[in-house]
């Protein structure tokens, strides 16, 4: 039975606890914790007992964090078979990676059921010791899910070598034990899967495997041969050679991916099963220290599942090989019924690949909210559970902290408490400011996979809903003052974090979003002053505020994340898009309408907006305009027409259309890589060809229920037309005839 217990005693007169003692939050949430009434003060030194046989990585943690001497508080450490912990055998959970921890004023005991358990017991001890004093405590603990962690499987800029090393330290502290290396943009994982890594990259892989092992993380190297593999002896030999080369680098866990492939032969279950069984026999079973294979199938979600592929794979594939699964769709949370459905078909427990908080399909958003939606009853039904993170490694830790909580102790998982603890853990010096930032970066916005997250901008939502609901945006001094204060918090929080020297790796990643958050706050404060100007009948102030807000909006649109040479994706950050951005749009429209009703206005300042700014699909004859060769650094290619919606990289078919206030024309940008259309309909921009609003912006006309896109007069006044391959610019005489 799982216990979360506090023992409370009635104190006699004259006896009291140390005023500074406390009950400490432990992460992940342990299976059983018993706090006593006795206060414990962090010792200056400790005396090790059992250090001759205990796990070396656990001992190194102890020695790195404590002074060791023969006169210190006794700390007994070891694994189940060690003589040092024999007196405590009955207390050690008989579970893989389990541990028993006792902290008292007489002795500290860290007793693991195995080496990982000892290591995790020390990690819990170190969390406690971050406090100078706390109540004495006994912990009996083990994980619900034996394989839990992260799969680096997103499309975009892969994590750096330093990112990965920092991740392993984080995983060790939070008891995550799996990292699957599968970055889509590593050619030696994908295109060059047959070739060995060059020497410099091989050294990096070896270091990753070593550092992961020190943190009790299984470094799983994934191979993605599905694009072009042949089911022949030559490719079988190439596969063995590649795996052997990785083994020599220290890798002891392997995965093979057949996801997101389109070759008919490569997608067949029988070919995949025979190939993987060969690798299991000829490689895994011939190395005593290699873990069972993990494979990602071609039909990795229910929405793509046919009638025969999964049952055939489950029947023919060696039962020791794990099969990955993303749920009902590519991006989905996992429930109990999902597990019953898939486990029955593959004749084993599915290995969950959770596509959250990955944001490669909504790259302008950071997903910093609570991690929720997965059932808390599936622990016994999963063979493993890994999260696909964002390309922003440090920002991903908000969610990964909760993934660790969830997979360790599923029934007691509290998404909101875990979220709060994650923010405090990652940004303890600026928790309140960081919380404000996270609150405004929760939802994904409209996206091709349909996943949305509730709870963004919660305080503002209350006031905005009241302003719009009761008054239809009409002037209300009290509500506008309340809204104004919330945007003051937004600006102040952004300033606090932008000026901080704490957690530089995290702040560097989120800096573009912090800048956007501040600008949004400043823009809304100008909108509120525009309300006041209309109320005061001050036309000049209204126009001045509006023009100032346009300048801030243009500055906001110019902020780019990952804007470095070679970057694969360069998003313009979106912040508070669920509540605040629509509020800004509606309020600007409302205020301009009121202004026009009362004053003679200039059309150069207040142009007519034919199409509201936002993300759009561009369709013609039932086909979707697609950025097929998305690459932020590619030049000279054209978008093409596709008959099907892109369900793997939906942003290839999403186009960000925005009006430039200074010209009254529209800019058209692809959401996948941030490249914009030029006057000829191509992606011809490069680092040496900057955006030119006289050449690269468009007039948009609505005629006969359709839209026409026309280049500027400087670019020839051409209209975009469609042919079989894509779009091209032609003379714009006779718009009606061309539509």
Predicted regions and their residues:
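Acidic, His- and aromatic-enriched active-site or binding-groove loops in soluble protein domains
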Residues: 200, 204-205, 242-251, 273-275, ...
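Substrate-binding groove of N-acetylhexosamine-processing glycoside hydrolases
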Residues: 26-29, 34-35, 278-304, 310-605
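Lectin-like carbohydrate-binding module/patch detector with strong preference for beta-trefoil
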Residues: 602-739
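Active-site groove signature of glycoside hydrolases
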Residues: 242-268, 291-300
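Short, acidic/polar
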Residues: 159-170, 235-245, 309, 335, ...
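Acidic, contiguous N-terminal accessory segments
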Residues: 19-105, 131-139
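Bacterial Sec-dependent N-terminal signal peptides
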Residues: 1-25
